[in-house]
């Protein structure tokens, strides 16, 4: 899925800082960025991360497992789990940071998750109006719906449907 583009640090624009603290007073923090190709060094957070892209693909290495995050799926990273990521092409990044308390109701292991149309719409709306910490009553209600959608998201073991071709089946087993 990745092209032959080779990342060279000298050609890279300045890296967006990896947050070391965010306002989780409401339990949720919404992050949205347009990211140029980059490599994000190994790090961990005290909060959980629901990572989603509206454009592009990001490769994440989480606890010894590799995940791809295309626009059809999100990747869940529990609190305090070391991870790093690479995006070889520009991406439109959306992330919901969840407090450790809220994260405790989500999977204990990193996993891919579905993104409902409702959740996608809320994350896009918050990006368009730059909501990071919901401030108004409508924003707080939307944030609660986003949380409900994250909690209800299906965990996905494989991004691709199983092959139907007899020629492909041996390669995928």
Q: Locations of the language-model features?
A:
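A short, Lys/Arg-enriched amphipathic alpha-helix from helix-turn-helix/homeodomain DNA-binding modules
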Residues: 138-173
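Short histidine-centered beta-strand/loop micro-motifs
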Residues: 38-45, 85-88, 105-108, 135
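Short beta-strand segments in beta-sandwich/barrel cores
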Residues: 40, 55-61, 74-75, 83
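Generic protein-terminus/edge-of-domain signal
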Residues: 1-57
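Ligand-binding loop in jelly-roll beta-barrel domains
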Residues: 80-110
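Short acidic-glycine-tyrosine-enriched beta hairpin
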Residues: 64-79
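Double-stranded beta-helix
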Residues: 101-129
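A generic beta-sheet turn/junction motif
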Residues: 46, 62-64, 89-91
């Amino acid at each position: 899925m990745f092209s032959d583009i080779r990342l060279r640090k000298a050609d890279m624009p300045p890296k967006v800082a990896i947050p070391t603290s965010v306002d989780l007073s409401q339990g949720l923090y919404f992050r949205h960025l347009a990211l140029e190709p980059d490599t994000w060094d190994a790090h961990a957070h005290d909060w959980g991360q629901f990572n989603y892209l509206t454009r592009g693909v990001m490769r994440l290495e989480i606890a010894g497992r590799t995940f791809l995050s295309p626009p059809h799926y999100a990747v869940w990273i529990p609190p305090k789990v070391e991870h790093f990521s690479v995006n070889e092409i520009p991406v439109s990044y959306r992330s919901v940071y969840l407090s450790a308390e809220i994260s405790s109701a989500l999977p204990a292991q990193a996993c891919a998750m579905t993104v409902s149309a409702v959740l996608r719409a809320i994350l896009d709306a918050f990006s368009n109006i730059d909501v990071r910490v919901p401030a108004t009553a409508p924003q707080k209600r939307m944030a609660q719906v986003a949380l409900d959608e994250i909690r209800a998201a299906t965990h996905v073991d494989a991004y691709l449907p199983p092959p139907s071709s007899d020629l492909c089946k041996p390669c995928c087993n």
